[in-house]
Curated annotation (Swiss-Prot):
Domain of life of the source: Viruses
Protein name: Uncharacterized protein R118
Keyword set, alphabetical order: Signal
Key word Signal present: yes
Signal peptide range: 1-21
Segments for region (Disordered): 293-317
Length: 356
């Protein structure tokens, strides 16, 4: 091949890659757990055999007051709990461990059930194939020793709109108190800063209130904007836009991780936002940078590299989704779903959030 022709092809390919990636070379340094995947369908109990997808991991370190309440239920007070769900779930799952690398033991009875939510709405599940609950985010209310679960739900009472509600538990397992109010759209994540609880939703819009439930004030969409690739946006409301977020605060910065529908492969992206001055002026750094992408077979790297689509992944695909950053005892971690929604994996970030 003539040298000039080779250079031309290389330049065209490079421009195409930059347009469709919107990332820099500062990829996150991650060390994947040797035990990955730490959760998949083969490790689920018989109760869950009909579930296809695993997504939206949320990991918490178990405080003493919660350990004491878990002991009579599961026979131990585990160090960590991980909540997750099926994409169109009938319940929220929970697993537990004393080591983040696993093994993670699934609590077979599960936690919040769709049937409970339908009962709270006085709705019937007969011939109902549309209702669902999923995407649990957990806030630990230490003052009241209560576990608060933000979750998304679809019920006939709201014409099956995908919105979020809250359930409460004293033990992290039995969520018997359900607040049926619609507090926002789906895929809520939270962080606490300067006396407020802040929430983000699927499109990356920011909300806040003193208690994270009542009198929520709307903020900007700067987080969602940081993950948008305008060259990919086609008007369908999904392609080129944020899928789901994970958040963690360190000092005056919020570190934000997410993935974008339409990327090939869909991979973990990252940005950050300084939390100083008027909250309505906060801006996430644009554009979101490359985090890391599928590299192993269990992450789907051996599968075709094609643009991702909205919705559930019912078969393994070359995608990472649903990042959840986690900090414990001076170490930084990332949990995420692999091969689309085929399982959950974990990694340590030796250089932590700043990648330095």
């Amino acid at each position: 091949m003539h040298w000039s022709r080779f250079v031309g092809i290389f330049l065209v390919f490079s421009v195409f890659s930059l347009v469709n990636c919107q990332c820099d070379s500062g990829e996150l340094f991650v060390v994947r757990f040797p035990t990955n995947p730490i959760m998949n369908n083969t490790r689920m109990c018989m109760t869950y055999d009909n579930d296809i997808n695993i997504n939206f991991p949320t990991v918490i370190k178990t405080p003493i007051w919660l350990k004491n309440r878990l002991y009579p239920i599961i026979g131990r007070g585990p160090e960590y709990l991980k909540y997750f769900s099926d994409h169109h779930g009938k319940e929220i799952f929970v697993s537990y461990t004393d080591d983040l690398r696993g093994p993670w033991v699934v609590h077979a009875p599960g936690t919040l059930k769709l049937s409970q939510v339908l009962d709270a709405f006085n709705a019937s599940s007969v011939n109902d194939t549309k209702s669902e609950i999923a995407s649990a985010d957990i806030y630990l209310d230490h003052a009241n020793k209560t576990v608060r679960m933000y979750f998304h739900r679809r019920v006939p009472n709201d014409n099956y709109a995908i919105v979020s509600s809250i359930a409460y538990s004293k033990d992290g397992i039995n969520f018997d108190n359900i607040d049926t109010r619609n507090i926002g759209s789906a895929y809520i994540r939270h962080f606490v800063h300067d006396g407020y609880i802040y929430l983000t939703d699927r499109v990356g819009k920011l909300w806040r209130s003193r208690d994270g439930v009542n009198n929520l004030e709307p903020g900007t969409t700067t987080i969602g904007d940081a993950f948008t690739n305008n060259s990919m946006v086609n008007g369908d409301g999904y392609t080129g836009l944020l899928r789901h977020l994970g958040l963690i605060k360190s000092g005056d910065y919020l570190y934000i991780y997410g993935t974008r529908i339409g990327d090939s492969p869909e991979r973990i992206l990252r940005t950050k936002m300084k939390l100083t001055n008027d909250w309505t002026t906060w801006n996430a750094e644009y554009p979101a940078k490359e985090g890391f992408r599928p590299e192993t077979d269990y992450e789907g790297a051996n599968l075709p590299n094609i643009p991702s689509k909205k919705g559930s992944a019912n078969q393994p695909v070359n995608q990472l989704r649903d990042p959840f950053p986690f900090y414990d005892m001076g170490r930084c971690y990332m949990f995420y779903t692999v091969a689309g929604e085929s399982g959950i994996a974990g990694a340590r970030l030796p250089k932590c959030w700043e990648n330095k």
